[in-house]
């Protein structure tokens, strides 16, 4: 696996979780808007109840998907942390800020007390080292 792709897994899973949460909020809003009609046509009331049941069922499914994604995120985060913790302190700190905290490189450089050019070199060296670690663990 490519080192950058390996490190970006956290961001992808974070985004999946964020999107699932937004979807869950949408269906929760829907369940609050769908109400049974108490007067008039009985068919209309049962249709509303069915819509409510479908929306509630979808909420339960999405909550389960979120729980699964969080579990995957925790596993991947631990795996990535185990790899980058093997780097020297500067490389570790920079990659943590870029891939875990999702800071832009310029902000990560400032947070690490590095000039931008130094951060670029440090990041490239760190990614090379991550690739070596990944390759070593695969074989």
For each feature predicted by the language model, list its residue ranges.
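N-terminal interaction/assembly modules
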Residues: 1-83, 132-139
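A short hydrophobic/aromatic micro-motif that marks alpha-helical segments and, especially, helix-coil
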Residues: 29, 103-105, 128-130
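Short helix-to-turn junction characteristic of helix-turn-helix DNA-binding domains
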Residues: 84, 98-102
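Helix-turn-helix DNA-binding module
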Residues: 101-118
């Amino acid at each position: 696996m490519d080192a950058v792709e390996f490190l970006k897994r956290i961001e992808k899973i974070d985004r999946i979780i964020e999107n699932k949460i937004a979807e869950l909020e949408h269906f929760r809003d829907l369940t609050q808007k769908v109400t049974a009609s108490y007067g008039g046509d009985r068919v209309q009331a049962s249709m509303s109840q069915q819509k409510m049941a479908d929306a509630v069922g979808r909420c339960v499914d999405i909550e389960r998907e979120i729980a699964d994604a969080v579990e995957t995120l925790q596993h991947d985060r631990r795996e990535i942390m185990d790899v980058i913790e093997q780097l020297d302190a500067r490389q570790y700190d920079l990659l943590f800020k870029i891939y875990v905290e999702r800071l832009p490189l310029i902000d990560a450089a400032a947070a690490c007390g590095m000039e931008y050019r130094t951060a670029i070199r440090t990041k490239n060296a760190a990614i090379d080292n991550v690739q070596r670690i990944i390759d070593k663990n695969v074989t």
